Amino acid sequence: MKDYKNELKVKVDLGENLRGSIPGLIKKVMYKTQYLEIQVEKKNLLPVLRFLKESSKYQCTMLLDIVCIDCLNIEEIKIGRFKIIYVLNSIYNNTRVHISTYVENNGIIETTSGLFESSVWLEREIWDMFGIYFEKHPDLRRILTDYGFVGYPLKKDFPITGYLEVYYDVADKKIIYKPIELMQEYRNYNFGAVWGDYERKVYLENIIK
């Protein structure tokens, strides 16, 4: 059986020691069951990541993932629309550390490819899906969508239909891009209304009749 109290104590010790080791660079420390989250300002991201990787005490030498979250319409978050989380792993301490920061819409943040080679493709994916520009990235191109794609599909305000229709023209033997043409205006459907207890009963009774 896992000793969660001991795991949490290890994370608390790491967080407090880290706060004391690099004073002024850490904005907030949050202790989760599975990981330790350190929130920093965008300008302090690289110094904190470098310290965690190169310090013999922490040895966060693996960048497992970079996660981007669109915080559009979340009133509590006013420091930037997008939350970017760098997921680090320390085999030495047997723990994961999340370094998080916020970036504004269409914002710019410096690449971490100089510290972690694995971030090259991860940053390309975030650029492709969210439109966040990684400054000094060695090869910042789209990675999942095609080169003529318009917009960033994982942004919450991106339309479901997209902006362009793509198809292959057999006669001209080439790929055609043209603006989306909808046959009817967009509609909002209330799919959830019939699944309440009372509403569902009335709905079924009407069907039986």
UniProtKB/Swiss-Prot annotation:
This is NADH-ubiquinone oxidoreductase subunit 9. Its EC number is 7.1.1.2. It is an enzyme of class 7 (translocase). It is found in: Mitochondrion inner membrane. The gene is nad9. It comes from Dictyostelium citrinum. The keyword Mitochondrion applies. GO terms for cellular component: mitochondrial inner membrane. InterPro entries: NADH_DH_suC, NADH_quin_OxRdtase_su_C/D-like, NADH_UbQ_OxRdtase_30kDa_su, NADH_UbQ_OxRdtase_CS. GO terms for molecular function: NADH dehydrogenase (ubiquinone) activity. Core subunit of the mitochondrial membrane respiratory chain NADH dehydrogenase (Complex I) that is believed to belong to the minimal assembly required for catalysis. Complex I functions in the transfer of electrons from NADH to the respiratory chain. The immediate electron acceptor for the enzyme is believed to be ubiquinone. It comes from the Eukaryota. It catalyses: a ubiquinone + NADH + 5 H(+)(in) = a ubiquinol + NAD(+) + 4 H(+)(out). Keywords: Electron transport, Membrane, Mitochondrion, Mitochondrion inner membrane, NAD, Oxidoreductase, Respiratory chain, Translocase, Transport, Ubiquinone. The lineage of its organism: Eukaryota, Amoebozoa, Evosea, Eumycetozoa, Dictyostelia. Complex I is composed of about 30 different subunits. Belongs to the complex I 30 kDa subunit family.
